[in-house]
Amino acid sequence: MKNNSKLRSWLDDLNLDHPLVIAGPCSAETESQVLQIAHDLKNSDVSIFRAGIWKPRTRPGNFEGVGSIGLKWLQKVKKETGLLITTEVANANHVKIALDHDIDVLWIGARSTVSPFIVQEIADVLQNTDKIVLLKNPVNPDLSLWYGGIERLYSCLLYTSDAADDRM
């Protein structure tokens, strides 16, 4: 896989004089909690506000996140603070819903990264978009698994000519 510096332009467009900082609550629990934290971070070095909307849990019955209602809270964060917004997506349906809510940055969490099937389904949904996607390291230290996820996402970009032309 060839490194393409043009794919980095979204980061350069932020015109940062400091490292990129992404911050926010691990889990969005209430609208007021999300908005309060976002306003507290607004005048800091934070460029991207993050909040977990869907929380993958090992056992059913534990808090699994507020779901898509939380995406409306993130939209409010962007409107009120000007911060870019991001959340974790764990499957193709999450991506579709996040795209419908114009979430700026998507991240694929460590649990999803370990499944090539999930990463491919997410990549397929992202075709014809110019969405920024971050891929977390897998829960087990397997560099080839992580690299495979990057290749799947990168291939999605390469085979999407309009989006690739816009981003390069």
Task: Cite the ranges covered by each PLM segment.
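N-terminal amphipathic alpha-helix/helix-capping segment at the start of soluble metabolic enzymes
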Residues: 1-22
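Active-site mouth loops of central-metabolism enzymes
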Residues: 20-34, 62, 86-88
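Active-site glycine- and acidic-residue-rich loops that bind
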Residues: 25-35, 136-148
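Glycine-enriched alpha-helix->loop->beta-strand junction motifs that scaffold or abut catalytic
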Residues: 45, 99-107, 125-132, 154-158
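Glycine-rich, proline-tolerant flexible connector loops at the mouths of alpha/beta enzymes
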Residues: 50-68
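Alpha-helix-loop-beta-strand connector modules within alpha/beta enzyme cores
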Residues: 64-86, 125-128
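Catalytic beta/alpha-barrel core
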Residues: 84-91, 104-115, 132-141
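Single conserved hydrophobic/aromatic residue that forms the stacking wall/gate
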Residues: 159-168
